[in-house]
Amino acid sequence: MTLHAYLGRAGTGKSTKMLTEIKQKMKADPLGDPIILIAPTQSTFQLEQAFVNDPELNGSLRTEVLHFERLSHRIFQEVGSYSEQKLSKAATEMMIYNIVQEQQKYLKLYQSQAKYYGFSEKLTEQIQDFKKYAVTPEHLEHFIADKNMQTRTKNKLEDIALIYREFEQRIQNEFITGEDSLQYFIDCMPKSEWLKRADIYIDGFHNFSTIEYLIIKGLIKYAKSVTIILTTDGNHDQFSLFRKPSEVLRHIEEIANELNISIERQYFNQLYRFNNQDLKHLEQEFDVLQINRVACQGHINILESATMREEINEIARRIIVDIRDKQLRYQDIAILYRDESYAYLFDSILPLYNIPYNIDTKRSMTHHPVMEMIRSLIEVIQSNWQVNPMLRLLKTDVLTASYLKSAYLVDLLENFVLERGIYGKRWLDDELFNVEHFSKMGRKAHKLTEDERNTFEQVVKLKKDVIDKILHFEKQMSQAETVKDFATAFYESMEYFELPNQLMTERDELDLNGNHEKAEEIDQIWNGLIQILDDLVLVFGDEPMSMERFLEVFDIGLEQLEFVMIPQTLDQVSIGTMDLAKVDNKQHVFLVGMNDGTMPQPVTASSLITDEEKKYFEQQANVELSPTSDILQMDEAFVCYIAMTRARQDVTFSYRLMGSSGDDKEISPFLNQIQSLFNQLEITNIPQYHEVNPLSLMQHAKQTKITLFEALRAWLYDEIVADSWLDAYQVIRDSDHLNQGLDYLMSALTFDNETVKLGETLSKDLYGKEINASVSRFEGYQQCPFKHYASHGLKLNERTKYELQNFDLGDIFHSVLKYISERINGDFKQLDLKKIRQLTNEALEEILPKVQFNLLNSSAYYRYLSRRIGAIVETTLSALKYQGTYSKFMPKHFETSFRRKPRTNDELIAQTLTTTQGIPINIRGQIDRIDTYTKNDTSFVNIIDYKSSEGSATLDLTKVYYGMQMQMMTYMDIVLQNKQRLGLTDIVKPGGLLYFHVHEPRIKFKSWSDIDEDKLEQDLIKKFKLSGLVNADQTVIDALDIRLEPKFTSDIVPVGLNKDGSLSKRGSQVADEATIYKFIQHNKENFIETASNIMDGHTEVAPLKYKQKLPCAFCSYQSVCHVDGMIDSKRYRTVDETINPIEAIQNININDEFGGEQ
C-alpha cells in the first residue's frame, strides 16, 4: 500500500514519465502483476494507442487502460457481480418520470411542473448528483426535520426526497444504478486478489466526486501501489490558477492521513512538451502578477474575424497550409471550442476543404428521420391525428420510402390537406381524398390530364398505405394493457411496417457506397430503439399502464438516445470542447470562439438545488455536493490554461466581432492577458490580412474558385482588386485540372436578373389568341410585368391554406350585401334595427357554410370571427340606411356581371377592344352596385364598389391616369354602354364613381366623459362616407345629398359647398362630365397599351414604384423573380407623381363621342 503523486504544471513530463514507467515494466516482465491505468472515458482510446503504436512492445497482458466503470466490471468478473439488473440512463429517467406522475398530487413545490418532460430530466440529474456525493434519502429527510429553513427550500427538498425514496424503494433488490454499482465495487475491493497485486496509475483528472474519492481510497488501501498524476504546482491558495487540481490533492492528502500513509511526491518542473520559447513563456507567465514581456517568435497567433463562418473558413485554410507546407498530418492538429454553435459549422465547412475530422461529442438521435417518424407517430395518436404531427410523419419518408418521387407526392398531399383543413378522423374519410377533389386544388376549374390523374392516384394510394399503418399501430396499442404488451405491440408494429428490413437494406447500401458513418447511425438507431423497449419491459414488466402514459414514458426514453461514433480513420483532425477534450501533445492547436462570455463563460446554476441551498446544505449537514457556480467561475482560467497548453509547436486563438444574431462580441479578457505577455503579438484581422495577402485565400481548389468569383464581382463593380486574382483566373481557366465548374461560376458575374422577352408564337401559346381577362389582371401587369407573366403565363399558384384570407373576407361581405340588397330591392331606407339583425343572420346562415369548406364553423376562433362579421354587416347596413335616406339615387343592380357574350339577360355586354397586334381584348368582371337617378328623361348612374380594405377604398386619379387603377372607369364605361339592358333612358350620364369601405369603425376619445351615445352613433356612420369622383353637374350634386346647402360638407359623399353655393375645393372630389369621359376613353387606351405589351412578350422584373412603395411588399412571386434592390433597382419603373391628373387628362386630345351608348 504505497501512494505516489506526480505533481507539476502542464507539459512537464508527468504523463510521459508514467507511460515510460509502465512500458519499462511491460518490457521487463510481460506477464507480471497487473498494471491499471485509470483515465477519463474520452482519453482511454488515445492512451491505448500510445501502447499499441510503440514498436518496442511486442504485446503484453499486464496493462489495461480503464475508466472507473470499466474497472468495476473487471473486478466483478473476478469476485462476482451484483444480482440486480443495471439501469441505463434512459431506463432511470423513464422510471423517475413515471414515479413523478404517480406522486404528483403529493408534491408541494413541483406539482405544476410534474407533467413537463424537462422536469423529470432535471430530477434524474439531481438524484444522480446526490448519489455521486453519497447523499441518501435519509440524509435529506433528517436534514429537513432537524433544520429551520425557508418554506420554498423545505418544500423543494421534501419533493425531491419523496421521489428519491420512492425511486430507491422501486429499485431495491431488483435494479441498480451506475452510481450504486460503483458503491458495490467499493464493497468488493477487499475480495479481489487481482487488485491486491496491481500497480494503479490515475491520470487525466482534475476533479472527482465523493463516490470517486471513495473508490480511490479503496484502491490506495487494497492495491499494491497507486500513482496519481495532477496538473498543479501544489499551491493550495483558493484563488490559485490550479485551485481545482490542488483541491484534489488536498482530498488525497486527507485520504492518506485516514489510512495513516505518506504521499511520495515527485515534482516536475522542467518543461518538455513545448518546442519553442513562445509556448514555454505562455505556460509559465499566464498566471503571474508581474508580467515579463518577451518578443513573440510567431508560434502564437490571434485571429479576429467578423463572423463565426469566416473564422472557421480561415482555420480550415490554415490547416491546409500546415499539412502542405509544414508536413504535418491531420492527427497532429486539434480544434477546441466552447460555444456549441461551432459544432454545426465544423460539419458544414470542413468537408468543403476535404479535411477529415472527428468531433469528440455525443449527438442526440432525436433528429434522425427514423426517430422523428417514431416520435411523430406517437404524437399522432396522442393528439388525435392533428395535421402537424401527421405531416412530420409523412415527411420523414420512412413509411413512404417504397414510392418513387415520394417527397413530391407528400408535397401534393400536404397542399391538399392544408387547403381542405384535414385533421382528426377526417384523415380516414376516403371520400375526402377522392382524385376528383385534387383536380380543384388551388384552382377553380381544371381538367386533369392523364399524367396528373396517375400522380394523384399515387398520392391517394400513399396516403392510404400510411393511414393503414397508423391504424394498425393504434389498434395494436389500444389492445395492450401492460407495459410488456405495449412494448410487444410496438415492436410488432415496426415489423408490420417492415422497418427492420428497410433499415438493414439502407445500411448495406450506405456501406457499399463508403458512407460508413451513416450506416453506423442506422445500426445505432435500431439497437437504441430495441434497448428502450427492453428497458421498458425490464423496469415495468407486467405493470398495468394507460396507453397515454406508456407513450409519454417511451418518448422520454427516446430523448436519451445518443450516437456514439467511433473515428473512421486515425489520421484526422481532433475536435472537442475545451472542458472535456483530451488532445495532448498536438503540433498545432486552434482555440476558436475566444470571446468574452464564452471564455470565461458565465456559470449559472442549472440544477434543482441552487448554489445558496448547496452552501447551506454543506454548512449545516457537513455534506459536500457538486461545485457551486462561483467555484466553477474561479476555474475558468484553468480551463483556458489546459486548453492552450495542449500544443507542442503552435497555438492559434480566434474570436469573432459579431454574434449569430448580429450582436457585438468582445474579445476574451484572457486573450488580452496573453497579448500582454509578448512584444509584437499583434491581432490579425482576417479580412485585412487577406486584402494584403490575397494568395493566402488560395489554399483549396474549389473554395479558391468561390473566392475568385467574389473578387471578380468586386472588380466588375470598379472596386480595387489585387492583380493576383486576375492572374489566378487565367491560371485556373487554362488548367484542365482546375477549371471544372469555372464557367458556371463566371456566368453569375454578369447575372442581372433579366428575363427573356417572349416570342409572338409563345405569347399566343401562353395567353391564347384572344385575351379574356378581368380588370385586376391588367392592373397586375402595370404593377410588374413579371407578376403578370408568373400568374397568367406560367399560372403559378400559391398554396391555398385552410384559413381565412383577406380576399375571402371581401367575398363574404360582397355576397352578404348582395343577398340582403336583393331581398329589400335596394331600399335601405326601410331597414330598422330588428330587420337589419334578421337579414344579417339569414345571409350569414346562407353564405358562411360555403366559404372554404365551412371554414368559419371549424373552430371556436372562426365562430367568434363569424359573429364579428355579422356585427360589421349590421353597422354597414345602418350606414347604408343613413346614406339612402338623404340621397335621390336608388340602388338598382347588385353584383352585376359583364362579359363579351352575356350568359343571361342580367349580364352586361363588354365592348371588345383590339391590341396593336390585332388580338381581341375581352374584359369581364362584376360591378358591386349600380345606383340610378332619372330627371327630365336623363338617367344618372353611380358606380358603388365595396372594399374591405381601407387602402384600396380610395380613387387615386394619378393611378387612373397611368393605368394603375382601371376598375372604376371600366365599370362606368360598361354601364354607359348598356343603358337598354339596365332599363335606363336614352340619355345616360355618369354620376359618381364611389368606394364604400366595409369595416368596423373606431372612434377615439380622450376620456369616458367625452362619450355622447347619440353623437357616437352619428360619428360611426360618418366613417362610412363614400370616396371617389363625382360629376360636377348640379343635378348630380343635388341628388347625391339632398341636404346640401351653402357652407355644408356632406358626410355621405365627397362634396362640400362654399358660402356662395359653389363647390368647395377642399371638401369636394369632382370633375366635369367631359373630363370623366376623357378618363374613360384614356382608360380604354391604357387597356389596349397594356394588352399589346402582354402579347408583345414583356416579362421584365420591373415593379412600378409609386409613393416610395413597391408592389413587391405584397407579391407572392418574390421567390420566383428573385427581385433584388441592388440588382434590379435600375429597372424600377416610376411615373411623374407631381402631375395634376385632371389637368393632364384635359390636355389630351381624344376623338370620341361622349354620352349615350358608345
UniProtKB/Swiss-Prot annotation:
Residues 1-275 form the UvrD-like helicase ATP-binding domain. Keywords: 4Fe-4S, ATP-binding, DNA damage, DNA repair, DNA-binding, Exonuclease, Helicase, Hydrolase, Iron, Iron-sulfur, Metal-binding, Nuclease, Nucleotide-binding. It comes from the Bacteria. This is ATP-dependent helicase/deoxyribonuclease subunit B. Binds 1 [4Fe-4S] cluster. Heterodimer of AddA and AddB. Residues 269-583 form the UvrD-like helicase C-terminal domain. Despite having conserved helicase domains, this subunit does not have helicase activity. ATP binds at G8, R9, A10, G11, T12, G13, K14, S15. The heterodimer acts as both an ATP-dependent DNA helicase and an ATP-dependent, dual-direction single-stranded exonuclease. Recognizes the chi site generating a DNA molecule suitable for the initiation of homologous recombination. The AddB subunit has 5' -> 3' nuclease activity but not helicase activity. Its EC number is 3.1.-.-. [4Fe-4S] cluster binds at C784, C1112, C1115, C1121. GO terms for biological process: double-strand break repair via homologous recombination. InterPro entries: ADDB_N, DNA_helicase_suAddB, DNA_helicase_UvrD-like_C, P-loop_NTPase, PDDEXK-like_dom_sf, PDDEXK_AddAB-type. Transmembrane segments: none annotated. It comes from Staphylococcus aureus (strain MSSA476). GO terms for molecular function: 4 iron, 4 sulfur cluster binding; 5'-3' exonuclease activity; ATP binding; double-stranded DNA binding; helicase activity; metal ion binding. Belongs to the helicase family. AddB/RexB type 1 subfamily. Its cofactor is Mg(2+); [4Fe-4S] cluster. It holds the Pfam family PDDEXK_1.
